[in-house]
Regions:
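Short S/T/G/P-rich N-terminal loop/turn motif that feeds into the first structured element of a domain
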Residues: 1-52, 59-70, 79-123
């Protein structure tokens, strides 16, 4: 497995959905404009829009550290609107682990797997 994958989750607080979506759009714009090493950054809502899941892929731990720094204040604001948790898949650096030390983050180390390119597909 190359890089790091994340699944981040928000249980959105009641009455905070529109504010959450506004900040989500801001996060997406910041990542799109400033993070060439963010390979995937996709947001999904459940059917009643009380939960949001973000699927993220970064080239390495430094790219994820840059992501945290880039979102900065916006990250704090959006985390105030919901209960946040995250799962990191891969082998994060010690520096990254220190950066997320106060957050609800679980780490799953890579064992083995399969990765294939999809012919003719682009995002």
């Amino acid at each position: 497995m190359k890089g790091l994958q994340l699944t981040s989750r928000f249980q959105i607080h009641k009455g905070k959905l529109e504010a959450f979506k506004t900040l989500a759009n801001e996060c997406i714009s910041l990542v799109q404009e400033n993070e060439p090493n963010a390979l995937q950054y996709d947001w999904f809502f459940n059917s009643d829009q009380t939960e949001c899941v973000i699927r993220e892929t970064f080239t390495d731990s430094n790219a994820l550290l840059a992501h945290i720094a880039n979102l900065g204040e916006v990250l704090g604001k959006i985390q105030a609107l919901g209960d946040f948790s995250s799962e990191i898949y891969g082998n994060p650096s010690e520096e990254l682990m220190q950066a997320v030390a106060g957050m609800d983050v679980k780490v799953y180390s890579f064992y083995r797997g399969l990765e294939r390119a999809v012919a003719g597909k682009s995002r």
